Amino acid sequence: MFNNLTERLESAFKNLKGEARINDLNIANTVKDIRRALIDADVNYKIAKEFTDRVKDKAVGSKVINAISPGQLMVKIVKDELVELMGGEEAEFNTTGNPAVVLIAGLQGSGKTTFSGKLASYLKNQKGKSPLLVAADIYRPAAIDQLMVLGEQIGVDVYSERENKDAVSIAQNAIKEAKSKNKNIVIIDTAGRLAIDEAMMAEVANVKEAVKPNEILFVVDSMTGQDAVNTAKAFNERLDFTGVVLTKLDGDTRGGAALSIKYTVQKPIKFVSSGEKLDTLDVFYPERMAQRILGMGDITTLVEKAQAQFDEEQAKKLEKKIRKNQFDFQDFLDQLQQIKKMGNIKDLMGMIPGMGKAIKDVDISDDAFKGVEAIINSMTPYERANPDSITPGRRNRIAKGAGKQLADVNAFMKQFEQMRQMMKMMNKMPMGKMPGMRK
């Protein structure tokens, strides 16, 4: 996410490396490089200019204290301005009403229907809501089919009327259905187009007028940069939407949309989404995003994702096994599967400070774990529970069962043993426990 922008900003801050104090010359050079980085990231020139002017004004009036270098001070100023540019703080998401109504709008291909499913999953699993998805795209039967599949995957009902070509009546009937079935939030997936047109805008505006939604979310493909901002302006002028959703943040995103939309339409970014998995939806926090753009990672979100997936009782049992040096292949497989549930692996690693740059050109995907899973799944339950029982003969059988080379199995066994030895060493630390573990 934003790797190129991150590198360019880090390069700009190097202008201040070794400087004892901030002065007009090094500020000017740094600010010029920051402006270029923003423009190359597809941020509107006016926005980039105003942003860097504010950074310059703050830097000129700042004094460097002994504990902070000029470079660190500039990073702090830029981070604060990025946070402000993207909205300052988390935006409220209004789910009052019975039912509350959320209208989803955007161009075709923006990830609108997938987001509708993700939002329903988020509201059901994390907010305890009982959502109803509504297929109000009257032009594309495939959109109805897609929503039906998503609803089945997450256990959420989907309302549709395949023969009805009136989006307004579909939305109104869906709300009646929600009331009769005690659904407390209705998510209406409207039709998209390949480009903005009057008929599309009129239809969405009519649905809005008829159902009076609590929230109108404009879904935008973050990889489209300035085009996304221009589309947002057109939608906002007609719909006066309440918030923005940025999708496809796991792609080759330059950052222009994330950094420009709030300033341009004066509406907050409420959610960000990456990948096709239905649990890859996050509330948008400007400060956390600013940290990621500056290569500082996002430990807070990483911890929250882990807490949502890992069972506390299971964690206690695992802790005891690690203390007794009884960590086995089944434990390893269980942990691997929990980590995969947290989201895109490369995206998760990018939340670790400094890791985003290190893995930029490394091919990391969930597929990388498939070989390990195949090897463990080819073991008998006894072998999984007793790593020391795996003889050379058993390794041959496991390799054949997993469709792998013997060398692959040997390499994995070696890595697993190294991990067990590391755990053993940590258990021998003072106090006889691993750091952070309860005694």
Regions from the language model: what does each represent?
Residues 171-175, 179, 183, 195, ...:
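Conserved phosphate-handling catalytic cores of large alpha/beta enzymes
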Residues 109-110, 139-141, 165-167, 192-196, ...:
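Short, small-residue-enriched loops and turns at beta-alpha junctions
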Residues 16, 42-44, 78, 107, ...:
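Residue-level signature of catalytic and energy-coupling elements of molecular machines
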Residues 9-136, 143-164, 170-188:
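Primarily NTPase-proximal linker/entry elements flanking Walker-type ATP/GTP-binding cores
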Residues 6-8, 25-35, 280-281, 387-393:
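Short acidic alpha-helix initiation/capping motifs at coil-to-helix transition points
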Residues 141-147, 228-231:
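Short, glycine/polar-rich helix-capping loops at beta-to-alpha or helix-loop-helix junctions
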Residues 2-19, 288-439:
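Long amphipathic alpha-helical segments used for membrane anchoring, targeting, substrate engagement
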